[in-house]
Amino acid sequence: LVSVVAIAHNEGNRIFSCLWSICENNCHFPIEIIVVNNHSTDNTESILKKLGVTYYNEEQKGPGFARQCGLNHAKGKYCVCIDSDTMYPPLYITTMTKALQQKGVMAAYALWSFLPDKHYSQTGLFFYEKLRDVYFNIQHLRRPELNVRGMVFAFQTDTAHKVGFRTDIIRGEDGSLALGLKKYGKIKFVRSRKARAVTGYGTISA
């Protein structure tokens, strides 16, 4: 079993697309989909009810609290973290899971692309992503945890329970967990486009 855990804060306009992309994934193993509604004040919860997806409310606001809530409820051997404003390719779950099945791998992270809009052109984003990817390849050699983003992050569930997400920081809870997991094994950099997610430009500042 693989647990796919999404966190959502006021994502009523985007969460359906995210969950649709996950449901369209090609998997040859069972998965469970969990959504953590993190103190949303829009129609996120009503959409989750209509969709019939398993969800939990986390009233303590912040990605650390939300991701820890998801981890607490995950039943799978592997946990795949996603964000509700992001879409995933058809082989995303399979590709990330295969990375975790490699000997000694405790966690895996992938890359992502951006949707162009009025603020960021397709050409500008193309060159930004190329430069970022080169930087990530260099940084992975010594500090891979600094590359990790929760929307493209997967890990061994049992070991993650030993470490846990930090809830005392505004951001960086994903990299902090990766740093803790590094004590138990390798962090795998999944460069394949089969695991490359697509998200909005807000992640540029993350």
Regions found by a protein language model. Name each.
Residues 110-116, 124-146:
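Short, flexible, basic/aromatic active-site loop/helix in glycosyltransferases
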Residues 91-122:
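Conserved donor NDP-sugar-binding/catalytic core segment of glycosyltransferases
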Residues 171-177:
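Acidic donor-binding loop at a coil-to-helix junction in glycosyltransferase catalytic cores
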Residues 79:
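Short aromatic/hydrophobic "clamp" motif used to bind/position activated sugar donors
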Residues 58-74:
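Glycine-rich, basic loop-to-helix element that forms the pyrophosphate-binding segment
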Residues 14-16, 41-50, 91:
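Acidic helix N-cap motif at the loop->helix transition within catalytic regions
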Residues 21, 37-45, 86:
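A conserved acidic beta->alpha catalytic loop
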